[in-house]
């Protein structure tokens, strides 16, 4: 992975609100976290150095409140859109086929 792509991914992660964003050359791993995301207990973005892809990790949800489920669904969809964009950056794509609007 070249440094230009790494920089673009790091910049995108910072725009998404992640803190302490970096890339470890030794492990080929993107390092980042988001302490301000209260919804990260339901779904979070992770990076797999084995597959060289970003993923959405969804945690078990236990609730009977419709409004809470809808909020979790919106958060998961936002995570999916972010992951699609980050993975497009990794492959060198400058544009996705569909326009994506990320609402934080």
Give, region by region, the residue ranges found by the protein language model.
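Negatively charged, low-complexity tracts enriched in Asp/Glu with abundant Ser/Thr
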Residues: 1-32, 69, 86, 93-104
């Amino acid at each position: 992975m070249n440094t230009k792509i790494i920089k673009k991914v790091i910049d995108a992660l910072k725009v998404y609100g992640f803190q302490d964003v970096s890339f470890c050359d030794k492990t080929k791993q993107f390092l980042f976290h988001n302490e301000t995301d209260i919804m990260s207990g339901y779904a979070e973005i992770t990076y797999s150095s084995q597959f060289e892809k970003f993923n959405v990790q969804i945690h078990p949800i236990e609730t009977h409140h419709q409004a809470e489920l809808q909020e979790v669904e919106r958060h998961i969809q936002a995570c999916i859109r972010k992951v699609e964009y980050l993975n497009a950056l990794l492959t060198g794509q400058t544009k996705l086929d569909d326009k994506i609007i990320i609402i934080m």
